[in-house]
Curated annotation (Swiss-Prot):
InterPro entries: DHP_synth-like, DHP_synth_dom, Dihydropteroate_synth-like_sf, Pterin-binding_dom. Belongs to the DHPS family. Mg(2+) binds at N13. It catalyses: (7,8-dihydropterin-6-yl)methyl diphosphate + 4-aminobenzoate = 7,8-dihydropteroate + diphosphate. Pfam families: Pterin_bind (PF00809). This is Dihydropteroate synthase. It is an enzyme of class 2 (transferase). One of its GO terms (cellular component) is cytosol.
Length: 284
């Protein structure tokens, strides 16, 4: 078994209602400093979002979303950081790209805004297509009745890739994300994680976003049944990051960059020690 190079993507929510850190980085200066700190801890990419996609969140006015993300993206990009823009709106993505972002992370998988595919094709940037089967303007979070969640999510994602390519997007610029927690039950999420090698086998880079999600909190519930809160799910997130790397994921999107980077370093050292030990034995 080998450890594939993994992109650790730091989450930077410039929002007032995200599920784990809403309101913490609304001030642009605070947001930029947090982005810089995540890069110092090992993040390869900073994913900036100005609208929460948590269950039940009210949609943010596009003008507010723009006002939140543009100054942050501009400053981080000016400092040489690879920035991703987390949005479903083409107008917001365009402004972010003009401000220096190089990746569009679209949780709707291109379904929310028909102008997104032409924009990405014209800009020639990377595009993350996430799976969210019931995504709509109202954003229903009820989990669909999948007959085979792995096969159906895989098919939906590949259909999205085909549609993007047909719209002129470079296939080599696409990344797919199974959308853990988006209109999926905990059982669906675990099935998708277990089937990561099958998703990797599609040949399209895979991004996983399990960080701090509720299905981890449920798994780690206390003896009283209380779901563990988001800030108590970092160890579980780091374990998923390490396992994702072992199974060939392209990237992991996390809130606590250091924990996942540390986990990846430990697993990498463990795996790479074997050949070195054999060499020492032979030389001795």
């Amino acid at each position: 078994m080998s450890l594939a190079p993994v992109q650790v993507i730091g989450v930077l929510n410039v929002t007032d209602n995200s599920f784990s850190d809403g309101g913490r980085y609304l001030d642009p200066d605070d947001a930029v400093q947090h982005g810089l700190a995540m890069v110092a801890e090992g993040a390869a990419i900073v994913d900036v979002g100005g609208e929460s996609t948590r269950p039940g969140a009210i949609r943010t006015d596009p003008r507010v979303e723009l006002s939140r993300i543009v100054p942050v993206v501009k400053e981080l990009a000016a400092q040489g950081i690879t920035v991703s823009i987390d949005t479903t709106r083409a107008d917001v993505a365009r402004a972010a790209l003009q401000s220096g972002a190089r990746i569009v992370n679209d949780v709707s998988g291109g379904r929310a805004d028909p102008a997104m595919a032409p924009l990405v094709a014209e800009a020639g940037v990377a595009w993350v297509l996430m799976h969210w089967r019931l995504m709509s303007a109202e954003r229903p979070y009820e989990a669909p009745n999948y007959r085979d969640v792995v096969a159906e999510v895989r098919a939906d994602l590949l259909a999205g890739v085909d549609q993007a390519v047909a719209a002129g997007v470079d296939p080599g610029s696409l990344v797919i994300d199974p959308g853990l927690g988006f209109a999926k039950t905990g059982q669906h999420n675990w099935a998708l994680l277990n089937a990561l090698p099958e998703l990797v086998a599609t040949g399209v880079p895979i991004l996983l976003g399990a960080s701090r999600k509720r299905f981890l909190g449920r798994l780690l519930a206390g003896a009283d049944g209380a779901v563990r809160p988001p800030d108590g799910r970092e160890t579980a997130t780091a374990v998923i990051s390490a396992l994702a790397a072992l199974h060939g994921a392209w990237g992991v999107r996390v809130h606590d960059v250091r924990a996942s980077v540390d986990a990846l370093k430990v697993v990498g050292a463990w795996l790479h020690a074997g050949p070195q030990i054999e060499k020492v034995r032979c030389d001795g």
